[in-house]
């Protein structure tokens, strides 16, 4: 049922044109989709993004990154006492940086690279495709994704870095 919600959201309208999208608006749209789910599990979902940040990307790709990363974080925090997920978007002169932080268990030491491989999962009922899909999309835009422990939330902190410009 949960995966059907995601599929229905992504099918809602065509988002396949490479164009400048306002990332704050796109985050709010994805956030609206998650509101019922996070409320039912008492999860705090925060988005931090300046209203003026835009990036040239297919909207379907941006939404797929965000949805897969939030879904991954959701699975990590839903059984915990302190349930928080934060998505922060910032930019430098040359890059867009998206941070996905959660208060889950974090990534097991030594698994930082292999979790991005297809069918690798640390979850009991996981398929192991979400992070691989994100990695493929990020690399399509000549970007990078990495993970470390969140200093503030103590779970995982995924960092997506995408170059600006027409590379």
Regions found by a protein language model. Give the residues of each.
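Conserved DHp (HisKA) dimerization/phosphotransfer helix of two-component histidine kinases, i.e.
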Residues: 1-37, 42
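Conserved catalytic submotifs in the C-terminal HATPase_c
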Residues: 44-54
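Short beta-strand/loop element within the Bergerat-fold HATPase_c
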Residues: 82-94
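Acidic ATP/Mg2+-coordinating residue in the GHKL
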Residues: 102
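Short conserved segment of the HATPase_c
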Residues: 107-119
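Short alpha-helical Gxxx[C/S/T] motif in the catalytic ATP-binding
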Residues: 130, 134
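Detector for a conserved hydrophobic position within an alpha-helical segment of the HATPase_c
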Residues: 138-139
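Conserved glycine-rich
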Residues: 143-144
């Amino acid at each position: 049922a949960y995966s059907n919600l995601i599929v229905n959201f992504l099918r809602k309208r065509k988002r396949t044109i490479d164009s400048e999208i306002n990332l704050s608006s796109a985050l709010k749209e994805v956030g609206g989709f998650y509101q019922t789910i996070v409320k039912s599990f008492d999860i705090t979902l925060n988005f931090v993004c300046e209203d003026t940040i835009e990036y040239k990307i297919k909207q379907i790709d941006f939404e797929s990154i965000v949805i897969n990363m939030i879904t991954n974080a959701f699975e990590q925090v839903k059984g915990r006492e302190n349930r928080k997920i934060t998505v922060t978007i910032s930019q430098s002169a040359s890059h867009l940086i998206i941070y996905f932080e959660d208060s889950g268990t974090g990534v097991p030491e030594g698994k930082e690279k292999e979790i991005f491989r297809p069918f690798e999962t640390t979850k009991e009922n996981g398929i192991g495709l979400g992070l691989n899909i994100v990695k493929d999309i990020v690399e399509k835009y000549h970007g990078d994704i990495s993970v470390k422990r969140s200093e503030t939330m103590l779970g995982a902190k995924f960092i997506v870095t995408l170059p600006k410009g027409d590379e």
